[in-house]
Curated annotation (Swiss-Prot):
InterPro entries: AB_hydrolase_fold, Hydrolase_4
Region annotated Disordered, chain positions: 53-85
Keywords: Cell membrane, Cell projection, Endosome, Hydrolase, Lipoprotein, Membrane, Palmitate, Postsynaptic cell membrane, Synapse
SUPFAM superfamilies per the UniProt record, alphabetical: alpha/beta-Hydrolases (SSF53474)
Role description: Hydrolyzes fatty acids from S-acylated cysteine residues in proteins. Has depalmitoylating activity towards NRAS and DLG4/PSD95.
Topology versus the membrane: Lipid-anchor
Major enzyme class: hydrolase
A Pfam match: Hydrolase_4
Protein name, per record: Alpha/beta hydrolase domain-containing protein 17C
Organism: Homo sapiens
Amino acid sequence: MPEPGPRMNGFSLGELCWLFCCPPCPSRIAAKLAFLPPEPTYTVLAPEQRGAGASAPAPAQATAAAAAAQPAPQQPEEGAGAGPGACSLHLSERADWQYSQRELDAVEVFFSRTARDNRLGCMFVRCAPSSRYTLLFSHGNAVDLGQMCSFYIGLGSRINCNIFSYDYSGYGVSSGKPSEKNLYADIDAAWQALRTRYGVSPENIILYGQSIGTVPTVDLASRYECAAVILHSPLMSGLRVAFPDTRKTYCFDAFPSIDKISKVTSPVLVIHGTEDEVIDFSHGLAMYERCPRAVEPLWVEGAGHNDIELYAQYLERLKQFISHELPNS
């Protein structure tokens, strides 16, 4: 039996040619490396779409294209809570909902529109009405808002923060296709929706990015000042994930967060597992070292890419950072 051909960081020569030569542009490389949108685990119904039988969960196989075809929902007044005139959230079994219908009814969902004309599914979880801070949470890969909803409720209630999140273009009920340019347009639309719809000012917004979500988070934070930034398992760039020995940013690289982090003027907390098997720990360390206003990082000994939240020091560090290191008056 012939020996397999040489591989570089898990990639064969043929895979490398497919990755970088078909064609060699950042958007195509980004799409091949990074985006794994799951089958949607939720649907959003506008008020006029809710009928007598609408209380039953919508089919899990609903697609982003179907959501995009829905008529645009009426926007409640800025800061208004869920009510008869609001959109409703319906979860499939795969969302693994862990709370009661009462908590689900309190989750606010609506659509926004990006500068690239994609329809963006947005979610506001009001966990701590009296809290000063709201997290603008950019989630990781291969999940959508339906799967993250339970986590948001648990996290927000424990760190005393409200949480605003959104699905990237091509994820969940958001229309379009996932791409690097769409990532940046998506978080811009989310930022504007949080500010205008809920009246949250930049000094009360904490940008939280996890894994691929650190890419739009760093981009936005490099352009706008906010209360703080939390980078959970960040990556330096797409090429550096595939090839750890890469020392500079090439023109065909994607997600060059390492070149943007020096422009972030807000306090930055970096969190990374020392045994991360997807984005090596060296990425978190390098991002931390480039931050002009980095605070004490959280290096979780023995943690991988998807289990940092299971370690006690995760919540402890977040509470310390938000409740004691940031202004709370």
